[in-house]
Design a protein with these regions (language model features):
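Glycine-rich segments within core transmembrane alpha-helices of 12-TM secondary carriers
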Residues: 1-12, 215-225
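C-terminal membrane-cytosol helix-exit motif in multi-pass small-molecule transporters
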Residues: 7-12, 16, 38-59, 259-263
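Extracytoplasmic gate region of multi-pass secondary transporters
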Residues: 8, 80-125, 129-132, 190, ...
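A membrane-interface helix-boundary motif in multi-pass transporters
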Residues: 16-38, 231-253
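Juxtamembrane intracellular "pre-TM" segments in multi-pass secondary transporters
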Residues: 55-85
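Helix-to-loop junctions at the C-terminal end of transmembrane segments
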Residues: 131-143, 233-234
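C-terminal transmembrane helical hairpin of 12-TM major facilitator-type secondary transporters
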Residues: 143-196
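A late C-terminal transmembrane helix in Major Facilitator Superfamily
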Residues: 201-237
Length: 272
C-alpha cells in the first residue's frame, strides 16, 4: 500500500497538472514509477542477501509424516466439505481478480484523471489489511462460515450496484458505496476462507493435503480471469463492458453463497 502511494506521487510529479498528455510524456511518467519500483525491489534483495541468517543448517533428514501418502489424498478427495470449500475459494478469488479493474472503472466510466484513478487502487490496498484484522477478530467470536455468507452477500450487493448501470460520472457517493461493499466483502473472504478448515471437520493431519487440492483448483482464475475480463471490456467499450464484468461477479457471488450454505448444511448434518 505504501509502495503504491509513493508510485502515485512519482507519477503525479512527472505529469503535474496536465490533463492532455502525449504518449511520450505518459511513457516518461510511467518509466519513473518503474525505475523506483525496480530500485526498491533490488534494495530489498540486497538486504536479504546480506542480513538473512545463513547459519542455520538445512534439515536433510526425511520425516515419514512429510512424505506424500496416497491414502490421505483419497480421504481428502472424498470429503464433501473440501469440495464445497473449493467452490467457496474459487468464487471468492474471482471476486479478488475483479478488484483489479476498479481503478480502470474510475478512469473510463467515472472520468477520473490518472492520478485520482490510481488513488482508488491505493486506497483499496490500505483497506485490505484493515478488513483482514477486523474480520479476524470477528471470526474469533462467531462461525467463520457465517461471516463468509455475509461477505458473499456484500460482494453480491456491490456487484449489483455496478452491473445495474446506476453509477455514472458525478455520482461519487454511489461509486464509493459500490466499491466499499464489493471490496470489504472480497477482502473479508480472502481473510476467512481457509479459516473454516476446522469447521469443515478436516483433520489437522490432512490440512496440508486439503489446502493443496483446494488451491490447485480454486486459484485457476489466475489463468483465465484476465482474458475473460479483457474480452468483456473490449467487446462492449464504455460502461456496458464493465456492467458485463460485474454481472459475472454477481453470478459468482451467488454461487459462493450456495456453496457456503451447502458447506454449513453438510457440516451440521455430520454433527447431528
Amino acid at each position: 500500500a505504501v509502495l503504491s502511494s509513493v508510485g502515485i506521487l512519482i507519477f503525479a510529479h512527472y505529469i503535474g497538472d496536465a490533463t492532455d498528455l502525449t504518449l511520450s510524456e505518459r511513457r516518461d511518467a510511467f518509466k519513473g514509477v518503474l525505475i523506483f519500483t525496480s530500485v526498491f525491489v533490488a534494495a530489498i534483495g540486497i538486504l536479504v542477501f546480506f542480513f538473512l541468517d545463513k547459519n542455520g543448517e538445512p534439515d536433510t533428514s526425511t520425516d515419514v509424516s512429510q512424505v506424500f501418502v496416497w491414502s490421505d489424498f483419497m480421504k481428502v478427495m472424498n470429503m464433501p466439505s473440501v469440495w464445497y470449500l473449493t467452490m467457496i475459494v474459487f468464487c471468492a478469488y474471482m471476486g479478488y481478480k475483479v478488484t483489479d479493474i476498479f481503478s480502470l472503472y474510475a478512469k473510463e466510466v467515472m472520468l477520473y484523471d490518472e492520478i485520482s484513478a490510481a488513488g482508488i487502487g491505493s486506497i483499496l490496498l490500505y483497506l485490505r489489511p484493515l478488513v483482514g484484522v477486523i474480520i479476524g477478530l470477528l471470526a474469533d467470536r462467531t462461525q467463520g462460515s457465517f461471516l463468509i455468507l455475509l461477505a458473499f452477500i456484500m460482494m453480491f450487493l456491490g456487484s449489483i450496484f455496478f452491473a445495474s448501470g446506476i453509477i455514472n460520472p458525478g455520482l461519487n457517493s454511489l461509486f464509493f458505496i459500490g466499491i466499499t461493499l464489493s471490496a470489504v466483502g472480497i477482502y473479508a473472504l480472502r481473510a476467512l476462507y481457509f479459516s473454516i478448515l476446522k469447521e469443515g471437520l478436516i483433520p489437522v493431519t490432512l490440512t496440508g493435503t486439503a489446502v493443496g487440492v483446494i488451491s490447485f483448483i480454486a486459484y485457476t482464475p489466475d489463468i483465465f480471469s484476465g482474458p475473460i475480463i479483457g474480452y468483456l471490456l473490449d467487446s462492449a467499450p464504455g460502461g456496458a463492458g464493465y456492467r458485463s464484468v460485474f454481472s459475472l461477479l454477481a453470478v459468482f457471488s451467488l454461487l459462493g453463497l450456495v456453496a457456503t450454505w451447502a458447506f454449513r448444511k453438510s457440516v451440521s448434518s455430520i454433527h447431528q
